[in-house]
């Protein structure tokens, strides 16, 4: 199928929920993608922070092929070895106590919200609890996750959403404090806001929220779906801050392309929250997914991925800062590790489109931010190539 046929038939058959770029990728290798015409692209999007090890990683591919040939699915009515091994690895990496595997990030958020509500129900003997979320946040598009996503543009067509959600301002502790009442059972936030424009939490804010939660017996839910799995130089971004959540969510690079998410919790929460019959999934945590997650976590630990991210991050920041200094319409850079954003006064969608013409894949975050979330295996030579290509694009603006 050629490019034009693929695009035409996709437009005729797939629901129009995305404004896609006119590119059909055929295969990938390392940090590069190749379209159906054979054109090469340096990938600084990684499938929206998914492909931590890039493309065509032989160890990962072989692990999945082996598991496909052996056993893919049996249901959660039975035990399976791959997901048990994966569970032990993710709990070790996160220093949490219990995990539930889902099919996606938004499902992980749904499970986290249910766990928080059930915890409060068990503790207090009644329902009707509230949750505090953040403005400009993004947690997913299913109804529960959408209810805690602080963006009216996403929410309005689907109202009424889940009641009892109150929104505070990210990185403004007093805003959170003002919303706490006797009904508050949880506070949910992204450790680094992604779709909202790449805003890391400040130390004062995240540590302050943790203290408020401890004071009022409120559960802290940290969304690590985009910023977790080594992207910031720690396995999970909250590990930079000297705090620990009661519940956290993960997805994206957790499976490196295999659809999988997870919500994790401390033993204290697990003892009072979800019990048999409270939650479930048909596909979640099957042997195939287990092989993917187990392999990803094994490779990350063995290859010291977080150390590599810490080493390469200053070089990426230096190159992006140089571009901000050069172009007046670039006004700031912010981010943590290999999750960076550059604020732009010109249309970022047009810049991302123009970058494709130059063989560079970058994406946007909100209306005015160029987002850089490359595979975690990039080297200095890839950062140099990105900066050179992006410089050429910006010259044309």
For the regions a language model picked out, list residue spans one by one.
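Conserved N-terminal phosphate-binding loop of PLP-dependent enzymes in the Aspartate aminotransferase
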Residues: 1-397
């Amino acid at each position: 199928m050629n490019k034009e046929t693929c695009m035409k038939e996709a437009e005729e058959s797939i629901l129009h929920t995305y404004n896609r770029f006119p590119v059909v990728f055929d295969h990938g290798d390392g940090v590069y993608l190749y379209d159906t015409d054979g054109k090469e692209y340096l990938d600084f999007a990684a499938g929206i922070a998914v492909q931590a090890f890039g493309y065509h990683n032989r160890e990962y591919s072989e692990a999945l092929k082996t598991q496909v040939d052996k056993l893919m699915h049996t249901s959660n009515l039975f035990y399976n070895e791959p997901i048990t091994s994966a569970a032990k690895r993710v709990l070790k990496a996160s220093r949490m106590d219990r995990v539930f595997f889902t099919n996606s990030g938004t499902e992980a958020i749904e499970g986290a919200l249910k766990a928080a509500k059930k915890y409060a129900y068990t503790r207090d003997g009644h329902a009707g609890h509230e949750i505090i979320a953040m403005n400009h946040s993004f947690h997913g598009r299913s109804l529960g996750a959408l209810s805690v996503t602080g963006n009216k543009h996403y929410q309005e067509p689907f109202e009424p959403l889940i009641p009892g959600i109150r929104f505070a301002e990210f990185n403004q502790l007093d805003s959170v404090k003002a919303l706490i009442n006797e009904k508050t059972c949880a506070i949910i936030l992204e450790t680094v806001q992604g779709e909202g424009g790449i805003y890391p939490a400040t130390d004062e804010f995240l540590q302050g929220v943790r203290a408020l939660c401890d004071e009022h017996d409120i559960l802290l839910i940290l969304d690590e779906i985009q910023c977790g799995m080594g992207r910031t130089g720690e396995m999970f971004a909250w590990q930079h801050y000297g705090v620990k959540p009661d519940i956290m969510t993960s997805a994206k690079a957790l499976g490196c392309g295999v659809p999988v998410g997870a919500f994790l919790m401390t033993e204290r929460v697990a003892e009072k929250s979800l019990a048999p019959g409270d939650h479930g999934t048909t596909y979640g945590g099957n042997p195939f997914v287990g092989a993917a997650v187990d392999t990803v976590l094994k490779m990350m630990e063995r290859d010291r991925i977080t150390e590599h991210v810490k080493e390469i991050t200053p070089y990426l920041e230096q190159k992006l800062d140089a571009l901000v200094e050069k172009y007046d319409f670039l006004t700031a850079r912010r981010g943590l590790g290999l999750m960076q954003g550059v604020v732009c006064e010109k249309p970022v969608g047009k810049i991302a489109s123009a970058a494709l013409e130059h063989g560079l894949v970058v994406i946007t975050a909100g209306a005015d931010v160029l987002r850089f979330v490359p595979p975690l295996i990039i080297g200095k030579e890839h950062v140099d190539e990105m900066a050179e290509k992006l410089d050429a694009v910006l010259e044309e603006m």
